[in-house]
Amino acid sequence: MATNGFRPEYEDLGRYEDILGQLPMLQVYSHIMLPFAMPEGLSQDTIIADLEAAVRQIRAHVPWMAGKVVNVGKGPDNSGRYIVVPCPPPDPLIVVRDVTHAFPPYKEIQRLKAPNSMLDSRLLAPTNAFPQRFEDSEEDPFRVIRLQASFVDGGVFLDFVTQHNMTDAGGLFGFARLVAMAMRGEQFSDSLLEQVNRDRRNIIPLLTPDEPMLDHSHHIRPPITDAQPVVRPDPARWHFLRFTAAKLAELKDLASQTMTPDPEVPYITTDDAVSAFCWKKYITVRHRRRNTPDARSRFSRAMDGRKVLGIPAEYMGDLVHNVTTWLTFRELVDLPLGEIARHMRRELNRANTAYHVRSFATFIAQEPDKSTIAYGGRFNPDTDVGSSSVLRVDLFPVFGKLGRPDFIRRPNFPGIPFPSLLYFFPQNPQGECDSLTCLTDADMEALNQDSEWTSMVEYIG
């Protein structure tokens, strides 16, 4: 059922304060960028008008997306609360830039498959990005949503940006899908608005006193002191990789054939197989340099808690928890792919539960100073891998007259690398999965010389 309005309670911005979004590490912006070829006869003015109309429709029906995020109550040993408050609309509603002078024609970008080296955030993004914190100000408010359209010869890049305390990856992609719906001339259904504007305050039932909390100590990061300063990793850069549909299927078949029977693991997924492959190869090339077979490596997978909590995919708040698998360097080098994938799936089956999400939320809720909590905790980029996969998410909808995007990308923020991070983006209509990873030059050079790696992975750059 379509609607032109919404319930009055949606305007109560207090309903959008949740628990998992209270981490100071989320005081950042998340970006997803979609490049499009300009259809014949479609003007820039028409695209801009359609985008602005879409943003107006979203602001009118999703009040929290029209606001900004502020931190209140912060003090000694207390990280405060992140809440959304009203904010005047930006003028103009979206950022528009003509960057034709700085880019080759879009057909050339298509031919090169939009490598990361071409995607300069100084030109294509309206603001900074994770892991760089954003500070709210009168001149530049910490808006919940931002959108930039950057025009090149024959194409346009749309950069969708959301505030991370208010949305996880599901919410970021949800913002892009709302824009696509509005550009197709669709109204937002009552059921969609119910989830997008859902009351977040009690969406995760905390543990009761008689329910034991699980161990989440690995999410505590060490304090930064003179005695224990921040360790600066080797220089690292972001790279795009591609797994074709055939290679994804080949990896899954290989993993399935080399996995020993396990009653806890009735099956493994494509996600398990490709994650295990990357983990194995990353550590293999590092082991050749380090020769530390007994060193422990951690693979941390960000998991969407919606399904286990019975919450629809359209819900846009933070519902991420992490599942961790530990193996030694020796195991990762020597074990067949299927055994590594089996270990990962077993840990996921054990931890990807409603109880685990409730326990993690309780852990966060009980800690006044949440600045010590991080998804990666004591993350060591030389031994560990942090991963987020949305391989199965559909993010190639039709954006009205613009049609479907050609790629899913993220602007390149070269000054803020995060070594050993790995994103798997949604598969395109051809079944190809593009991956964004941040690796040291030594790691990337070694991988590109590894025949097993290059037989499975196309390097885009």
Curated annotation (Swiss-Prot):
Could you cite one Gene Ontology molecular function of this protein? acyltransferase activity
Tell whether NAD is among the UniProt keywords. Answer: no
Pathways per UniProt: Secondary metabolite biosynthesis
Its EC number(s): 2.3.1.-
Description of what induces expression:
Expression is under the control of the azaphilone cluster-specific transcription factor azaR.
Keyword Acyltransferase part of the UniProt annotation: yes
What is the annotated signal peptide range for this record? Answer: none
Q: Which UniProt keywords apply?
A: Acyltransferase, Transferase
Q: Which InterPro entries match?
A: CAT-like_dom_sf, Sec_Metabolite_Acyltrans, Tri101-like_N
Pfam families recorded for this chain? TRI-like_N
State the source organism's domain of life. Eukaryota
Q: What class of enzyme is it?
A: transferase
Q: Which family does it belong to?
A: Belongs to the trichothecene 3-O-acetyltransferase family.
Protein task: O-acetyltransferase; part of the gene cluster that mediates the biosynthesis of azaphilones, a class of fungal metabolites characterized by a highly oxygenated pyrano-quinone bicyclic core and exhibiting a broad range of bioactivities. In the first step, the non-reducing polyketide synthase azaA forms the hexaketide precursor from successive condensations of five malonyl-CoA units, presumably with a simple acetyl-CoA starter unit.
> What protein does this entry describe?
O-acetyltransferase azaD
Q: Which organism is it from?
A: Aspergillus niger (strain ATCC 1015 / CBS 113.46 / FGSC A1144 / LSHB Ac4 / NCTC 3858a / NRRL 328 / USDA 3528.7)
Taxonomic classification: Eukaryota, Fungi, Dikarya, Ascomycota, Pezizomycotina
